[in-house]
């Protein structure tokens, strides 16, 4: 999961002479060393026995090194003992019997701008008003401005209601719970953990997720919603719920219908990943005709190559054998199952797949233009206005086709939109797509937080309108060229979307009808979002109006005429 670190003005001045990437790297390493030294000093001063053992300093440094630099940047050095707890949990997670290792603490967030040292006071009736002095430690990773502001609002509300209620249950007066998980890193882990918390009625107020260099995770959530000011019952409840999720993850709901061996009563090792076949299509790739070229991209669970199949240029997505498990196989099977029947000019064309472990791969048409995400955020490209509308409508047409065939994509984002040499955009990556249930609603959670609909984040039932919300975020990306919620981590953005109604800021110069459409696309109530067929009509209408305005004004020679979004003008030119 991508997380962002923001430089201070001072650090940019100090490293002004260095290349940006080198300056950022040096800054992070320097801060990591400073944090390590401070944590070590505090642990030794607190007379923690382990801190004085031979080799402890090296062990602590190894702990910082196996986690991303962001861990050192975010951790609260005043809670040095929490670093030891994180180290212990990660060590405990080595044993499969201990997974997930769980720790629960009571924490208290200090409202921004209010002193933590104010004593409790008495009102005229002789009752003691709630004290503002924290009786519990702060969260291990401090707190975001949003969480501090939330605590401040609750504290002020508490002041207003003090005369009417002695036992005020505001966020500030009632401590929060900080829950730390450590387990083996795997696909969809965050979704499982957030689903676990939701099942217990817990509301996530703050979240931090870290992956170690050796394949483990450290996930920290600050939550409210537990009715008791204690930790043991909550920990036991979490362990019970985690056991249920672990059992569910070991099963494959569609295995029975997918597996001919099981239907025939056969047992033994599978020779291929079972995928439904109605006998009308042949999609198993003959590896003799598949030629690999250079690697295009690499991820945690697979690599993407350019190649040829029977002399046709293709893209080959290969799953890494060492990362294969039932979850990844299920995702692979689902992608093949859906893509083999999809035929549309705005959906990436499936050519075939190899389903014989350990060489699992999916072969599709090659898209030389790359992804919309790379074009916008890495190449700093700009779509000229007519092209922007064309791209937006292309995506709509592809998604409308999928929805007409009862397919919900569930992970619509700029990285999953690919361009050919003619700037035709096609929807790709169906690894987490699903055929809509007959009931019309679904409850499995996946996708990427920055683009995810609130009902999916909250693990509530959802339908095809979840894709419409994601499309709204993509359309905003096309207009601005910016990453959604770029100054927040993905988890912080998710909390903001659900609990505070957070949405990307629509630039002031946006055409009024387009601004209105964006707001409809990311409505919290999914029933208020339009279908893709309606979106296509509205975009075509807006494009026509903007074109007419441009013709009348005759002021733009760049194709970015002043009707819709003057802020689209950037120094980078389209190529």
From Swiss-Prot:
GO terms for biological process: cellular response to hypoxia; chloroplast organization; protein phosphorylation; response to abscisic acid. Serine/threonine protein kinase that specifically phosphorylates chloroplast precursor proteins in the cytosol within the cleavable presequences (transit peptides). May be part of a cytosolic regulatory network involved in chloroplast protein import. Does not phosphorylate mitochondrion precursor proteins. Specific for ATP and does not utilize other NTPs. Plays a role in chloroplast biogenesis and differentiation in cotyledons, possibly through phosphorylation of chloroplast preproteins. Residues 178-252 form the ACT domain. It comes from the Eukaryota. One of its GO terms (molecular function) is protein serine kinase activity. Its EC number is 2.7.11.1. The modification Phosphothreonine is found at residue 443. It comes from Arabidopsis thaliana. This is Serine/threonine-protein kinase STY46. PANTHER family: SERINE/THREONINE-PROTEIN KINASE TNNI3K-RELATED, SERINE_THREONINE-PROTEIN KINASE STY46. GO terms for cellular component: cytosol. The keyword Thylakoid does not apply. The active site is at residue 411. Disulfide bonds: none annotated. Belongs to the protein kinase superfamily. Ser/Thr protein kinase family. ATP binds at residues 296-304, 317. Autophosphorylated on serine and threonine residues. Autophosphorylated at Thr-443. It is found in: Cytoplasm, Cytosol. Disruption phenotype: Retarded growth.
């Amino acid at each position: 999961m991508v997380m962002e670190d923001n430089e201070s003005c001072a650090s940019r001045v100090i490293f002004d002479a260095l290349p940006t990437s080198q300056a950022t790297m040096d800054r992070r390493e320097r801060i990591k060393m400073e944090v390590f030294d401070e944590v070590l000093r505090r642990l030794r001063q607190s007379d923690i026995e382990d801190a004085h053992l031979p080799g402890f300093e090296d062990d602590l440094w190894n702990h910082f090194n196996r986690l991303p630099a962001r861990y050192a940047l975010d951790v609260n050095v005043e809670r040095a003992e929490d670093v030891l707890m994180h180290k212990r949990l990660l060590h405990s997670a080595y044993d499969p019997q201990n997974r997930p290792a769980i720790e629960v603490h009571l924490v208290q967030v200090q409202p921004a701008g209010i002193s933590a040292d104010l004593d409790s006071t008495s009102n005229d009736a002789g009752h003691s008003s709630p004290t503002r002095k924290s009786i519990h430690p702060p969260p291990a990773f401090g707190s975001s401005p949003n969480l501090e502001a939330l605590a401040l609002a609750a504290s002020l509300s508490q002041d207003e209601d003090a005369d009417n209620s002695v036992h005020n249950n505001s966020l500030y007066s009632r401590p929060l719970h900080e829950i730390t998980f450590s387990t083996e890193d795997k696909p969809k882990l965050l979704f499982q953990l957030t689903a676990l918390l939701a099942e217990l009625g817990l509301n996530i107020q703050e979240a931090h997720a870290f992956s170690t260099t050796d394949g483990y995770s450290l996930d920290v959530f600050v939550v409210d919603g537990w009715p008791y000011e204690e930790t043991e019952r909550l920990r036991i409840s979490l362990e019970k719920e985690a056991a249920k999720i672990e059992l569910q993850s070991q099963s494959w709901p569609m295995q029975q219908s997918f597996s001919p061996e099981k239907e025939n009563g056969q047992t033994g090792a599978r020779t291929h990943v079972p995928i439904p076949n109605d006998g009308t299509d042949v999609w198993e790739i003959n590896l003799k005709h598949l030629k690999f070229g250079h690697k295009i991209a690499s991820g945690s669970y697979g690599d993407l190559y350019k190649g040829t199949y029977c002399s046709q240029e293709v893209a080959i997505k290969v799953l890494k054998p060492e990362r294969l498990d039932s979850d990844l196989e299920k995702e692979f099977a689902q992608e093949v199952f859906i893509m083999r029947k999809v035929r549309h000019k705005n959906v990436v064309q499936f050519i075939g797949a190899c389903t014989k472990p350990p060489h699992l791969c999916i072969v599709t048409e090659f898209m030389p233009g790359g992804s919309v995400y790379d074009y916008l955020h890495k190449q700093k490209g700009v779509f000229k206005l007519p092209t922007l509308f064309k791209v937006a409508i292309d995506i709509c047409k592809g998604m409308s086709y999928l929805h007409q065939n009862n397919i919900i994509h569930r992970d619509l984002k700029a990285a999953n939109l690919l361009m050919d040499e003619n700037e035709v955009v096609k929807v790709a990556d169906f690894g987490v797509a699903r055929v809509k249930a007959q009931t019309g609603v679904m409850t499995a959670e996946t996708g990427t937080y920055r683009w995810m609909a609130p009902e999916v984040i909250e693990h509530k039932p959802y339908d095809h309108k979840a894709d419409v919300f994601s499309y709204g975020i993509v359309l905003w990306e096309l207009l601005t060229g910016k990453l959604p919620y770029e100054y927040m981590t993905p988890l912080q953005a998710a909390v903001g979307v659900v609990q505070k109604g957070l949405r990307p800021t629509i630039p002031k110069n946006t055409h009024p009808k387009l601004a209105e459409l964006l707001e409809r696309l990311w409505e919290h109530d999914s029933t208020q979002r339009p279908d893709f067929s309606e979106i296509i009509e509205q975009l075509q209408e807006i494009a026509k109006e903007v074109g007419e305005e441009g013709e009348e004004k005759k002021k733009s020679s760049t194709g970015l005429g002043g009707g819709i979004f003057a802020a689209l003008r950037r120094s980078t030119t389209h190529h």
